[in-house]
Amino acid sequence: MKLSRISAINWNKIQDDKDLEVWNRLTSNFWLPEKVPLSNDIPAWQTLSAAEQQLTIRVFTGLTLLDTIQNIAGAPSLMADAITPHEEAVLSNISFMEAVHARSYSSIFSTLCQTKEVDAAYAWSEENPPLQRKAQIILAHYVSDEPLKKKIASVFLESFLFYSGFWLPMYFSSRGKLTNTADLIRLIIRDEAVHGYYIGYKYQIALQKLSAIEREELKLFALDLLMELYDNEIRYTEALYAETGWVNDVKAFLCYNANKALMNLGYEALFPPEMADVNPAILAALSPNADENHDFFSGSGSSYVMGKTVETEDEDWNF
């Protein structure tokens, strides 16, 4: 069998400047959950009711499931369709950071929660029909041989499906609760925003090579898939937040982010403003300066703790 020639990646010869731009953004944004002082949230966690704690654990377990899908199936499936080696490299970075995101929720659990409560949430996630359904819908497209439909599914996961879960820590943060946990979630949101934008960009570039009929067919597919996911997400939200009185607020947040997902694909918003009218407190919590602890763009700040080096002299070690 004749082996094909393998070419080394050359970052000094870029076919698409967006690959380097996004690579630089992702690497400059790099972070790890161990650097966020989650233990500072223990007092606030203890003020939550048992129902609020259970809701939070379930929300984060659902998010862990989505990150796991994107890490082991989503980004790797997109790599097979990459046009440039630099695109493959960016997608490998995306895959790794999805693993970091999944690890982050385990850091929250080990810091704030009892093991039996977390185990119960994981068991719940495996038996929750809407949660399992959205995973199945997305995975079905990841294993298909249609590259652009994979990208559509990936953008909807990155830019839409996460947000029924992201709403809760932003809500608590807007009330001064679990602020360090919210800082960690903002780091995740920052990553997901870049992921959704980049994959949507690659989708739009690929569309330019298609006929008008093919483009229209993909648009209709995207809208149908979004509505299938939206209807399922409404069921998930109504069940998850049933006892809270927050269901309508979360639904508005879903519509808001569904519109953003469509825009990442180059399409117009679907949901009217009155359906996507998000509570200003939530939008403020999402903003880069939402918490004084957190520097959104550099990943630094008092809630993201990096070690500092100080030069010493020999006499410093004479105790």
Swiss-Prot record:
Q: What's the cofactor?
A: Fe cation
Keyword field: Deoxyribonucleotide synthesis, Iron, Metal-binding, Oxidoreductase
* Residues bound to Fe cation 1: 67, 98, 101
| Record-listed E.C. numbers | 1.17.4.1
Reaction(s) the record says it catalyses? a 2'-deoxyribonucleoside 5'-diphosphate + [thioredoxin]-disulfide + H2O = a ribonucleoside 5'-diphosphate + [thioredoxin]-dithiol
What does the entry list as the binding residues for Fe cation 2?
A: 98, 158, 192, 195
Matches recorded under InterPro entries: Ferritin-like_SF, RNR-like, RNR_NrdF-like, RNR_small, RNR_small_AS, RNR_small_fam
Q: Which residues form the active site?
A: 105
Query: What does the annotation say about its assembly with partners?
Result: Tetramer of two alpha and two beta subunits.
* Annotated function: Provides the precursors necessary for DNA synthesis. Catalyzes the biosynthesis of deoxyribonucleotides from the corresponding ribonucleotides. R2F contains the tyrosyl radical required for catalysis.
Q: Which family does it belong to?
A: Belongs to the ribonucleoside diphosphate reductase small chain family.
Mind telling me which NCBIfam families this protein's record contains? PRK09614.1-1 (NF007182), PRK09614.1-2 (NF007183), PRK13965.1 (NF010572), RNR_1b_NrdF (TIGR04171)
Write down what this protein is called: Ribonucleoside-diphosphate reductase 2 subunit beta
Q: Which organism is it from?
A: Salmonella typhimurium (strain LT2 / SGSC1412 / ATCC 700720)
Q: Which gene encodes it?
A: nrdF
